[in-house]
């Protein structure tokens, strides 16, 4: 096995100038955000896992109208949900008092609100027609036939991995680069099997392991908020860093005032894992919903993404009464370093900090 030296160069492969990738962040990223990052020399991304095929086509075209640079479209490759009426009703009963607190009633029945890319031929058809430069996968991988079709269309492919075993699957599938998602990352863990043991490797350890053991270029992700973090990732053997939380407070995102206020305030100092909001483990700033899930009396949530149907309904009920504490306030462990800047300014600042960090490290080279 080799280190990153001698591997295919990632930046020209993706058509970018800077080793800075804005994480896709379904529900947060917008065409304006992705295009601004692209136009500043990084790789902008859009998460379409929460959209149908028509919605994905729309945002791809909107982004193309704002930039002629390559951008990344991300999909969810989770196992399609298996409904369990008993578990779902128990979960709704647990949430009912919180709905009542805000003058609402829980849904009578929950729905599977997100179609997995594994079972979405319409989304594949959109990609083959629109041909975004890059498509990335989270929660797993599509079939070999789907990967072959995307590659035949000239689309570059990325996939998240949280351990060496998943990285080996990514490599064997013919994907172009691996996103090494450390435990520090905000949002959903990208594990392929949520029921399997999770090594919970940190970004430093995972990036170094994959850089040494894998033939593919590695992109470090998780807890990276500034140029110093990017420099550290590059020193560990990554060819780029993917930043999510760092971009959440950018002016181009779609977050509401409660999420923005939390990220730029004291709430950003504490993040926690919860499955209560969506039915799948994700890192969020601690809030009323994460506390609800941490209650020892809490039953098992409905499965992902069925539980998200209830989570979104409760958040909407609370927001209607001016309470923002039930949102999916996804954030990484270093969220307290977030800055509210236009995306282009943030990319420029990250590049300056990266160069400063590299220069500071030169003193140790003598």
From Swiss-Prot:
Residues involved in FMN binding: 74, 181, 186, 223, 242-245
Pfam family, any one: NMO
Record protein name field: Nitronate monooxygenase
Single GO biological process annotation from the record: response to toxic substance
Signal peptide: none
EC annotation from Swiss-Prot or TrEMBL: 1.13.12.-
UniProt function note: Nitronate monooxygenase that uses molecular oxygen to catalyze the oxidative denitrification of alkyl nitronates. Acts on propionate 3-nitronate (P3N), the presumed physiological substrate. Is likely involved in the degradation of P3N, that allows B.phytofirmans PsJN to grow on 3-nitropropionate/P3N as the sole source of nitrogen and carbon. Also probably functions in the detoxification of P3N, a metabolic poison produced by plants and fungi as a defense mechanism. Cannot oxidize nitroalkanes such as 3-nitropropionate, nitroethane, or 1-nitropropane.
Catalytic activities: 3 propionate 3-nitronate + 3 O2 + H2O = 3 3-oxopropanoate + 2 nitrate + nitrite + H2O2 + 3 H(+)
GO molecular function annotations of the record: nitronate monooxygenase activity; nucleotide binding
Organism from which the protein derives: Paraburkholderia phytofirmans (strain DSM 17436 / LMG 22146 / PsJN)
Family: Belongs to the nitronate monooxygenase family. NMO class I subfamily.
Highest taxon above the source species: Bacteria
